[in-house]
A protein has these predicted regions:
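RNase H-like, Mg2+-dependent phosphodiesterase core
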Residues: 1-186
């Protein structure tokens, strides 16, 4: 049975989209590995190669989606959408340790480094999210989204303290250093 690899990007971020990708490879692609271990330039090259040589589905949830229905529900809905897109003919492997009660999905810790289809999904999810962050960085350059990628770095927290939140931020995420910052958007 062919494998459909699934991974996500943007799970633990304060800002930006949550992107979930599912990939079924039609042919071998050299250089597939965990997207975090690949340069952005190489990720873009692999993204294009995967899109040409694989069946794939990318599901994106905005910060507002994550705030409205919650991270776990977004992840569950994304997994279900990928499962519905590909159907019953594949074995589904998701990077991590929980399948969010989606029974047909098997989980595997470090699958993004071990299973080429999951590596490909990792690359699609990360490259898609990075494109979203370019939009955020153009609109709000003072936040430095391209440097911290939406994570809770010191520079990102300082930017929120100075400028407040934007529509790219997840307002339901609690960070001690931001406890007294107004949730009104920039």
């Amino acid at each position: 049975m062919k494998i459909c690899g699934i991974d996500e990007a943007g799970r633990g971020c304060l800002a930006g989209d949550l992107c979930i990708a599912g990939v079924v490879l039609d042919k071998e692609i050299d250089g597939l590995k965990d997207s975090k271990k690949i340069s952005e330039k190489k990720r873009v090259v692999l993204f294009n190669e995967i899109c040409k040589n694989a069946k794939f589905k990318i599901v994106t949830f905005t910060s507002q989606d994550v705030d409205r229905i919650g991270l776990s529900e977004c992840l569950k809905n994304g997994l279900l959408e990928i499962l519905n897109y590909f159907g019953d003919e594949f074995e589904y492997i998701y990077d991590g340790n929980t399948n969010f009660k989606v029974q047909k999905i098997k989980t595997m810790i470090k699958a993004d480094a071990l299973i080429k289809e999951v590596s490909a999904a990792s690359i699609l999810a990360k490259a898609t999210r990075d494109e979203n962050l370019k939009v955020a960085d153009k609109k709000y350059p003072e936040y430095g989204f391209l440097k911290h990628k939406g994570y809770a770095t010191k520079a990102h927290i300082e930017a929120i303290l100075k400028y407040g939140y934007t529509n790219f931020h997840r307002l339901t995420y609690e960070v001690k250093a931001l406890k007294n910052v107004s949730k009104n958007k920039f």
